């Protein structure tokens, strides 16, 4: 059941009941909960608004600051804000913090009303069509009740759309200070047009609706400034730093990531000439991120659970139970900034807070120094002027062949030697690689005296899902004065990927549950089992296998009660059987239903999906009871799902195999294949008697093509030559190749297609092609298809280097890639 399907079943008329059955690991059986439906309006401000106390300090009286977190802009946002402002007015707060971090947006008119609540005059936002046509300005109205205290708006990369409208209005009308990260950058307007479908897609009238979402306009913030692609740049940018160590692994992040995902990072994003590209924040404050004890605060962009990048972390550091009183650096920082503010105007507020900002920077810098000192790094600061240091940097692997196996730890060693005459302070190296597991990792050396060398060993976890690839790692060297030129070498490392699993499966629908007549067919009102046996036909083991059965899209009347199973490892050639259970309701409409089956190794990312269609049979007689045994009298006798020559073949039995008999229907006899299932065999293919022995050979109904691809991992030139072979027990319909390069910021390119036109035998095909490449690492995906649903995939990562061995310059995203060769006939 998908989330949407669950929502559809939960929704209903107010004051009606819905039963929810919950299964827990800690409680045997299933527990029933009856819920009375009601009209639910999630609060826009959550947790509730509160007042933060600021104690008195040197030269500063005690103060109160109001705080609220606007989660989204919904129909009740303005109303919830009105209640919060009433609280702040009663408490006589000196400033207000509006937290829009993680707010994806929402209703345009609510964003306008929230902005209007703080701003007395001016254009809050403009909606402008193509070429400036159909312009609509939303202006502030002076209600006489707008708060006049200083205002701070907290934003991050996940503040989007309506959030950016509010932040842009506050900033550009000089009403308050914006603090945090640059926002997402979505300033476009989409309109959804309903289109009637020419063909039915489901059983309900709603299933036949199609929609076209068309971009028709854009939002402009005050001053006609577009946020599209650039977002709102904060007045005070805050950068979280990380210094952590667990065992031999450390996580150092002393500068912000360049890979924060925003609108401009998506292929084919829109741009506008009024967007302020290159705008910088007025101030920058870095702070040490301090996770709560026991929290896993590290995970890199590759998805490795053990390595979290700073930008992926929850800055609050609080659990859900603590949300009513949550706090973090940004909230504390904004609270103290507003408490000492002498003006509510944005520019005056920031310019008048220089001393406060310097104090915060010094305190956070001290925290970083102390954290690094615990790791044995001298992070003391040196003089700000004088002669620049001269340094040499060497990167080297800790293994002789620089080969790393996927799923293990990679160890890289950096050595910096001071070959100059002056000491170098706060020396660190930042790695640069197309592979996110290496990219932006930092090696920290600290103070290095003249003639001294210092080393740092970086340990990273290479995910088990990594493909075989060669990665080039470069490093930029920084000192207290910024980036420095340093003689050194780049490093090539080879990752050896694991052999991948591949899944085949056979299934059988068995009507032996509640309300079933055991004729092997599915009738309305029956509860049935779908027995799915999965075989790993690949070379490598599956590390964590999941099998999921879902209802067909928009389909009602099929209720799945057991639809998800897990298995840990599935070795090559090993099989595993899953027993799904579902019910066909008596009111099901139609003569056929569809089920979506997915089998996946969630660790390695290999999967198989298929759509299974099952016909509804008319009500018929139950099989006649029969006892005894039967011996198979022909070679590879087909055993079927039901009693009929056109029924699905679920397996074959060799001549001489003996089964126990349990029923008879027409010209077929039901035999017990094993303790968990039965099947039907033609009575003409058996004779009575015999001692039970032998077993069923499964009939694999879905086996994706076997695919082998040969390609180098490093090339010099504009393309890579690949060749391969695909084979299947039924059909290899075609082969196609896609290529993608993360840094090129272009859509995935379909670079090659070859249909199988072999005369006679279409169960195999050879192919070869020249695939275009871009600078750096290219993900080349080769697909071999049996059908639209059943296909196999092999991924090759190819590093494109310049003739001198360096990474060639990355072209502009607008540049065209090398032309792909024509498909081979």
What residue ranges belong to the model's regions?
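Long, low-complexity serine/threonine/glycine- and acidic-rich segments characteristic of extracellular
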Residues: 446-462, 568-571, 575, 703-720, ...
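Surface-exposed, short loops/turns at beta-strand junctions within beta-sandwich domains
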Residues: 14, 466-468, 586-590, 770-777
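Terminal connector regions
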Residues: 462-501, 583-620
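Intrinsically disordered, low-complexity Pro/Gly/Ser/Thr-rich segments with frequent PxxP/GP/PP motifs
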Residues: 436-466, 557-587
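Boundary regions of SH3-family modules and the immediately adjacent low-complexity/disordered segments
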Residues: 615-624, 672-702
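Short, compositionally biased P/S/T/A/G/V-rich stretches that sit at domain boundaries
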Residues: 381-402, 503-521, 688-715, 801-825
């Amino acid at each position: 059941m998908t989330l949407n399907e669950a929502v559809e079943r939960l929704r209903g008329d107010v004051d009606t009941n819905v039963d929810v059955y919950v299964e827990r690991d800690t409680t045997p059986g299933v527990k029933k909960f009856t819920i009375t439906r009601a009209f639910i309006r999630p609060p826009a401000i959550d947790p509730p608004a509160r007042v933060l106390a600021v104690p008195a300090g040197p030269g500063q009286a005690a103060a109160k600051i109001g705080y609220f977190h606007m989660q989204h802009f919904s129909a009740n946002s303005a109303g919830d804000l009105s209640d919060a402002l009433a609280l702040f007015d009663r408490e006589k707060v000196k400033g207000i913090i509006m937290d829009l971090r993680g707010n994806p947006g929402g209703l345009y008119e609510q964003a306008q009303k929230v902005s209007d609540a703080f701003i007395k005059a001016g254009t809050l936002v403009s909606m402008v069509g193509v070429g400036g046509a159909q312009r609509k300005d939303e202006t502030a109205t002076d209600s006489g009740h707008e708060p006049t205290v200083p205002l701070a708006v907290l934003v991050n990369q996940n503040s989007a759309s309506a959030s950016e409208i509010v932040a842009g209005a506050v900033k550009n009308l000089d009403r308050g200070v914006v603090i945090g990260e640059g926002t997402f950058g979505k300033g476009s307007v989409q309109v959804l047009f309903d289109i009637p479908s020419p063909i039915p897609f489901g059983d309900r009238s709603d299933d036949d609706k199609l929609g076209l979402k068309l971009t028709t306009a854009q939002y402009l913030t005050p001053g006609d400034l577009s946020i599209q692609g650039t977002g709102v740049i904060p007045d005070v940018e805050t950068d979280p730093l990380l210094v952590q160590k667990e065992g031999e692994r450390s996580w150092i992040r002393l500068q912000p990531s360049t890979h924060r995902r925003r609108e401009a990072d998506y292929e084919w994003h829109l741009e506008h000439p009024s967007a302020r590209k290159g705008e910088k924040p007025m101030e920058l404050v870095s702070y040490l991120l301090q996770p709560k004890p026991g929290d896993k605060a590290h995970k890199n962009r590759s998805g490795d659970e053990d390595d979290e990048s700073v930008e992926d972390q929850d800055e609050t550091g609080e659990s859900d139970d603590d949300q009513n009183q949550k706090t973090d650096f940004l909230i504390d920082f904004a609270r103290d900034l507003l408490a000492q503010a002498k003006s509510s105007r944005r520019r005056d507020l920031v310019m008048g807070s220089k001393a406060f900002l310097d104090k915060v920077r010094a305190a956070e810098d001290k925290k970083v120094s102390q954290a690094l000192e615990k790791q044995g790094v001298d992070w003391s600061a040196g003089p700000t002027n004088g002669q620049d240091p001269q340094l040499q940097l060497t990167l080297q692997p800790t293994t002789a062949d620089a080969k790393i196996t996927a799923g293990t730890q990679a160890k890289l060693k950096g050595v910096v030697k001071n070959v100059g005459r002056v000491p170098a302070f706060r020396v660190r190296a930042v790695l640069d690689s197309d592979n996110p597991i290496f990219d932006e990792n930092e090696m920290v050396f600290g103070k290095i005296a003249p003639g001294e060398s210092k080393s740092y060993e970086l340990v990273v976890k290479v995910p088990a899902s990594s493909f075989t690839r060669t990665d080039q790692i470069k490093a930029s060297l920084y000192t207290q004065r910024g980036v420095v030129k340093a003689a050194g070498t780049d490093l090539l490392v080879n990752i050896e990927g694991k052999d991948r699993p591949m899944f085949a499966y056979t299934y059988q629908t068995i009507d032996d549950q509640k309300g079933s007549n055991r004729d092997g067919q599915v009738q309305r009102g029956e509860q049935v089992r779908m027995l799915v046996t999965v075989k790993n036909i690949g070379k490598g083991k599956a590390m964590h296998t999941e099998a999921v059965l879902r209802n067909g899209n928009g389909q009602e009347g099929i209720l799945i009660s057991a639809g998800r199973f897990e298995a840990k490892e599935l070795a090559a050639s090993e099989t595993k059987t899953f027993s799904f259970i579902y019910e066909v309701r008596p009111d099901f409409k139609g003569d056929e239903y569809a089920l979506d089956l997915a089998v996946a190794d969630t660790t390695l990312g290999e999967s198989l999906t298929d759509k299974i269609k099952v016909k509804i049979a008319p009500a018929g007689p139950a099989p006649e009871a029969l006892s005894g045994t039967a011996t198979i009298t022909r070679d590879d006798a087909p055993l079927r799902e039901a009693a009929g020559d056109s029924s699905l073949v679920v397996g074959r039995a060799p001549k001489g195999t003996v089964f126990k008999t349990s029923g008879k229907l027409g010209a077929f006899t039901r035999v017990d294949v094993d303790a968990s299932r039965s099947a039907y065999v033609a009575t003409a293919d058996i004779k009575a008697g015999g001692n039970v022995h032998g077993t069923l050979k499964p009939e694999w109904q879905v086996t994706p093509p076997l695919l082998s691809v040969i390609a180098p991992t490093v090339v010099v030139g504009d393309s890579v030559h690949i060749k391969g072979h695909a084979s299947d027990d039924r059909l290899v319909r075609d082969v196609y190749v896609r290529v993608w390069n993360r840094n090129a910021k272009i859509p995935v390119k379909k670079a090659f297609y070859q249909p199988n036109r072999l005369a006679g035998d279409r169960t195999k095909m050879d192919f070869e092609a020249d695939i275009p490449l871009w600078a750096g690492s290219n993900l080349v995906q080769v697909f071999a298809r049996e059908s639209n649903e059943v296909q196999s995939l092999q991924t090759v990562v190819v590093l494109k280097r310049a003739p001198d061995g360096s990474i060639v310059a990355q072209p502009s995203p607008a540049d065209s890639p090398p032309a792909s060769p024509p498909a081979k006939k």
